[in-house]
């Protein structure tokens, strides 16, 4: 799949009374190309869940615009998107078999029964949803989402309830979905090591805005870990620095060549990079060209 999956311009969302409410998103602008597996990362309260809800058409922004799969109204493309929120809302009185049947009935012409049955795999079909564990409900919710054959999957902390084996299995399924069908996946998670091996795109949200955005590889390569005696870090942008004894370790955003005579230079892991930015909320933003929003095409705020 080519094109743009999600694009935001000055996106804002405030909950509560105007002027005195909670601002979950504030002048948030970015672009997500289609066909990527995107890690949506940030501290608690950064706006990740709000962004996913808006992209799923579960609300309207109070400022700016949000385009999903080319539509200025995300609600118009719900049949082409799948959303698994944190609370996995399923009907507790239904059985697993009833739930899968409902998925097929609600998605005529798109339903992939074989995929849904494969993901639901070990779940007893006669078991009622209310009797399932958190991890089992997650598996059923993902079976519904993948069975829909969406062009865009929005997953809010999807793996938190899963044991390591199930997590590994379902991450493999998600990767295959992108490789085989070009599905765009946006996945929020606090398990940074898991994201590093699975995601090729990054949106780091803090304070209601995207602070880092682009190809994960490009964002990592734009930074360096410098270790050495306390010295001059200019002209590089310092994201975080720490001193232990007479040795300084700094994560910098490179502005030209690094003086290797003064510093030992290594490339940070994605986890090291994200942890440093989590500890340094005032670090300047970085959006690669692919993540920079283009010209505004319309306004979809309330």
Q: Can you annotate each of these PLM segments?
A:
Residues 168-252:
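ABC transporter nucleotide-binding domain
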Residues 63-77:
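Conserved ABC transporter NBD signature motif
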């Amino acid at each position: 799949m080519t094109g743009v999956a999600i694009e935001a311009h000055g996106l804002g969302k405030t909950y509560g009374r105007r002027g005195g409410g909670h601002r979950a998103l504030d002048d948030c602008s970015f672009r997500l190309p289609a066909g990527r597996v995107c890690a949506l990362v940030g501290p608690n309260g950064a706006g990740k869940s709000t962004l996913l809800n808006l992209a799923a058409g579960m609300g309207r922004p109070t400022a700016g615009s949000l385009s999903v799969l080319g539509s200025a109204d995300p609600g118009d493309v719900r049949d082409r998107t799948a959303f698994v929120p944190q609370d996995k809302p399923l009907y507790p009185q239904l059985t697993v078999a009833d739930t899968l049947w409902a998925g097929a009935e609600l998605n005529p012409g798109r339903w992939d029964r074989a995929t849904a049955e494969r993901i639901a795999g070990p779940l007893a079909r006669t078991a009622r949803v209310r009797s399932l564990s958190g991890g089992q409900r997650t598996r059923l919710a993902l079976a519904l989402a993948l069975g829909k054959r969406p062009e865009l999957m929005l997953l809010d902390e999807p793996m938190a309830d899963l044991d390591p084996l199930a997590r590994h299995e379902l991450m493999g399924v998600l990767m295959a979905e992108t490789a085989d069908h070009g599905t765009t996946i946006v996945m929020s998670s606090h398990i940074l090591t898991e994201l590093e091996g699975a995601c090729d795109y990054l949106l780091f949200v803090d304070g209601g805005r995207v602070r880092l955005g682009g190809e994960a590889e490009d964002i990592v390569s734009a930074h360096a870990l410098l270790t050495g005696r306390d010295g001059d870090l200019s002209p590089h942008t310092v994201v975080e620095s720490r001193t232990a004894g007479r040795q300084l370790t700094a994560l910098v955003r490179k502005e030209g060549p690094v003086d290797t005579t003064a510093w030992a230079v290594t490339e940070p892991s994605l986890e090291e990079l994200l942890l440093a930015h989590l500890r340094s909320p005032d670090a300047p933003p970085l959006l690669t060209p692919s993540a920079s929003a283009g010209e505004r095409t319309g306004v979809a705020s309330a």
